[in-house]
Amino acid sequence: MATFLGNPVTFTGSQLQVGEIAHDFSLITPALEKKSLADFAGKKKVLSIIPSIDTGICSMQTRHFNKTLSDLEDTVVLTVSVDLPFAQGKWCAAEGLDNAIMLSDYYDHSFGKAYGLLINEWHLLARAVLVLDADNKITYVEYLDNINSEPNYDAAIEAVKVLG
């Protein structure tokens, strides 16, 4: 059972599994542009899903994946939260991560519902990492039972590297 701040939580929707094709989405960037999965066609994708960029672990996760994977060819890190796009942009500017791709699900939580990550009790996204190949097939997933803990960075990074 997943917990957030030590309390059990429930989710809307079903979590995706390895072998499935990732659902398309429409999310908002800090520049208020809509982005979908199709905008990253032909690239390997790391979906780094966090509750809020304004927390220590979420900031650490976002920095780690962006700094570690930014040099890999044909690979993008997509950080998804329900933070307002303005907050995401402000965080990136403060951290000097100008090339980080931040996507907000604040508007209708459609991403959280489709991916089974919307926490019913808080209307935040659960912490998760999904790796997609260039055809959007899910090759790695980590759903954290303790949403207040860090993901297994090494396993996710290795999952990207084995895609070539």
UniProtKB/Swiss-Prot annotation:
Enumerate the active-site residues: C58 (cysteine sulfenic acid (-soh) intermediate)
Superkingdom is Bacteria
Q: Give the EC class as a word.
A: oxidoreductase
Alphabetized, the UniProt keywords read: Antioxidant, Disulfide bond, Oxidoreductase, Peroxidase, Redox-active center
Q: Which residues form the Thioredoxin domain?
A: 16-162
Q: GO molecular-function annotation terms? A: thioredoxin peroxidase activity
> Reaction catalysed by this chain?
a hydroperoxide + [thioredoxin]-dithiol = an alcohol + [thioredoxin]-disulfide + H2O
The record's listing under Gene3D superfamilies reads: Glutaredoxin
Cysteines paired by S-S bonds: C58-C92
PROSITE patterns per the record? THIOREDOXIN_2, TPX
Q: Write down the SUPFAM superfamilies for this protein, in alphabetical order.
A: Thioredoxin-like
The enzyme's E.C. designation: 1.11.1.24
| NCBIfam families (UniProt xref) | PRK00522.1
Similarity remark? Belongs to the peroxiredoxin family. Tpx subfamily.
Quaternary structure? Homodimer.
Q: What else is known?
A: The active site is a conserved redox-active cysteine residue, the peroxidatic cysteine (C(P)), which makes the nucleophilic attack on the peroxide substrate. The peroxide oxidizes the C(P)-SH to cysteine sulfenic acid (C(P)-SOH), which then reacts with another cysteine residue, the resolving cysteine (C(R)), to form a disulfide bridge. The disulfide is subsequently reduced by an appropriate electron donor to complete the catalytic cycle. In this atypical 2-Cys peroxiredoxin, C(R) is present in the same subunit to form an intramolecular disulfide.
Q: What does this protein do?
A: Thiol-specific peroxidase that catalyzes the reduction of hydrogen peroxide and organic hydroperoxides to water and alcohols, respectively. Plays a role in cell protection against oxidative stress by detoxifying peroxides.
The record's annotation in HAMAP family points to:
Tpx
Write down what this protein is called: Thiol peroxidase
Organism field: Streptococcus parasanguinis
Gene symbol here is tpx
